[in-house]
Amino acid sequence: MTVVCWSSRLLLLLPYLLLCVFGPSASHAGRLLVFPMDGSHWLSMLGVIQQLQQKGHEVVVIAPEASIHIKEGSFYTLRKFPVPFQKENVTATLVELGRTAFNQDSFLLRVVKIYMKVKRDSSMLLAGCSHLLHNAEFMASLEESHFDALLTDPFLPCGSIVAQYLTVPTVYFLNKLPCSLDSEATQCPVPLSYVPKSLSFNSDRMNFLQRVKNVLLAVSENFMCRVVYSPYGSLATEILQKEVTVQDLLSPASIWLMRSDFVKDYPRPIMPNMVFIGGINCLQKKPLSQEFEAYVNASGEHGIVVFSLGSMVSEIPEKKAMEIAEALGRIPQTVLWRYTGTRPSNLAKNTILVKWLPQNDLLGHPKTRAFITHSGSHGIYEGICNGVPMVMMPLFGDQMDNAKRMETRGAGVTLNVLEMTADDLENALKTVINNKSYKENIMRLSSLHKDRPIEPLDLAVFWVEYVMRHKGAPHLRPAAHDLTWYQYHSLDVIGFLLAIVLTVVFIVFKCCAYGCRKCFGGKGRVKKSHKSKTH
């Protein structure tokens, strides 16, 4: 009886077993083309690529031969294309950018120098993009590969041109774009009354003068963006054989994976194809190496301070480095300072210089008391994920805005790296370490950030696969993309209704005037004629 019973059960299970063995896999293996941007942008994308490869997808990465960080990997195929510049040129550009942050020229001279540098650097990158797109053999090989989707960082829209040339759906992986290009390309509303512009140093609670400043910045910001991005429109027009603007390049993206969230950023409108994956770089913490474990253990009850200004800053002017070293020597904590420049002569015993440090792993250690950072988005999120209060020294780009957001939330103190003194840095460190409110605020942000139904990495992987499976996501694209500017703002409707109202008012006015003439004009003429007869 028992044997018969088990046989019956096996017969019932057999169809399901066959379905599992021979049926279609849950995740359709596809081919993904990746066109990343070098530097930290690439490093944050690596986790997504690795997960996709583990799910059976074939990943091909294309990059210039002059790339610094993009190298061969075990979970992707790297294909490099020639460009008209060398790796040394890219390195020199990054070093110069780091030095620019410590330039103490007058404001006007700094603006001119920054403008010239942006123009020079963007010309170099544009030349690399043009070299790729005119490489007929390389582009033909990409076309023959029949990719299911392209994953790229739209900060430089070369990947967008490649996607349109290959006619493949695109997934963007970014923090944000300058000049609100991301909002324009997604048709996302940006109310200037409570959404601060980049470099405005405003929060989302603005007074009248701050709102005036916000509007003026919105009007003027397109000048710099025209220098960087307009040439890509001309290049795309040549390659695609049709008139193309930068917005035309960016707007077809299926999904925008935004490396942000509303724990760091202020609440604002979003669109259906904008997916927030802030904190994706907060990977699983690893045990510290013996070297760093020894540093942490030797710090005693006071703990450690982690100090890094990012990979772009390799050297600091001697005077400023000595001011920083003096301030660090005044606190009881052990300071691990990632620095590759000349060793300051006044470096204290509690300060250890290292060429590299496992930043996320150190921030996750319970003995870490504070984090000195340049406020890059990666560092900010690692500070949030690990609940470490911050002393922020923003240098360029979106770092000023990141620092303002953390300061507004009471999670850190911001210093002007050009104007700060040793006393300022000492006081800032002692404030975030000894004032419990900073630790409480950053822990609250950390708790909010981690309270989510799905990890950012898994969410990013899901949406890339989604686009690969469905050949895009056109159902998430708003009809606003197909409207003219006057249709979008309903100016034609307003004009039509206004014309009707004015016409009705005009007709009513004419009718009233006619009625008045009939009622009062006739009597006046009769009386006048009667008087003339009596005389």
Curated annotation (Swiss-Prot):
Regarding tissue, the record states: Highly expressed in liver and at lower levels in colon, kidney, stomach and intestine.
Tell me yes or no: is Repeat among this UniProt entry's keywords.
no
**Signal peptide stretch:** 1-29
Q: List the disulfide bonds.
A: none
Query: What catalytic reaction does the record list?
Result: glucuronate acceptor + UDP-alpha-D-glucuronate = acceptor beta-D-glucuronoside + UDP + H(+); 17beta-estradiol + UDP-alpha-D-glucuronate = 17beta-estradiol 3-O-(beta-D-glucuronate) + UDP + H(+); 2-hydroxyestrone + UDP-alpha-D-glucuronate = 2-hydroxyestrone 3-O-(beta-D-glucuronate) + UDP + H(+); 2-hydroxy-17beta-estradiol + UDP-alpha-D-glucuronate = 2-hydroxy-17beta-estradiol 3-O-(beta-D-glucuronate) + UDP + H(+)
Glycan-modified residues: N89, N297, N435
Q: Where the protein is mainly located, per its record?
A: endoplasmic reticulum
Q: Which GO terms describe its molecular function?
A: enzyme binding; enzyme inhibitor activity; glucuronosyltransferase activity; protein homodimerization activity; retinoic acid binding; steroid binding
Tell me what turns on expression of this protein.
By dioxin.
One GO cellular-component annotation of the UniProt record comes to: plasma membrane
Q: Known Pfam families for this protein?
A: UDPGT (PF00201)
Keywords of this entry:
Endoplasmic reticulum, Glycoprotein, Glycosyltransferase, Lipid metabolism, Membrane, Signal, Transferase, Transmembrane, Transmembrane helix
Q: Which Enzyme Commission number(s) are on file for it?
A: 2.4.1.17
> For this chain's UniProt record, which GO biological process terms are given?
estrogen metabolic process; flavone metabolic process; xenobiotic metabolic process
Q: Where in the cell is it found?
A: Endoplasmic reticulum membrane
Membrane topology classification:
Single-pass membrane protein
Q: Which intervals of the chain form a coiled coil?
A: none
Q: For this UniProt entry, which segments traverse the membrane?
A: 493-509
| SUPFAM superfamilies xrefs | UDP-Glycosyltransferase/glycogen phosphorylase
- The question of whether Lipid metabolism is a record keyword is answered with yes
Q: Which family does it belong to?
A: Belongs to the UDP-glycosyltransferase family.
Question: So what does this one do?
Answer: UDP-glucuronosyltransferase (UGT) that catalyzes phase II biotransformation reactions in which lipophilic substrates are conjugated with glucuronic acid to increase the metabolite's water solubility, thereby facilitating excretion into either the urine or bile. Essential for the elimination and detoxification of drugs, xenobiotics and endogenous compounds. Catalyzes the glucuronidation of endogenous estrogen hormones such as estradiol, estrone and estriol.
- Kindly state the subunit structure of this protein: Homodimers. Homooligomer. Interacts with UGT1A3, UGT1A4, UGT1A6, UGT1A7, UGT1A8, UGT1A9 and UGT1A10 to form heterodimers.
- Name of the protein described by the UniProt record: UDP-glucuronosyltransferase 1A1
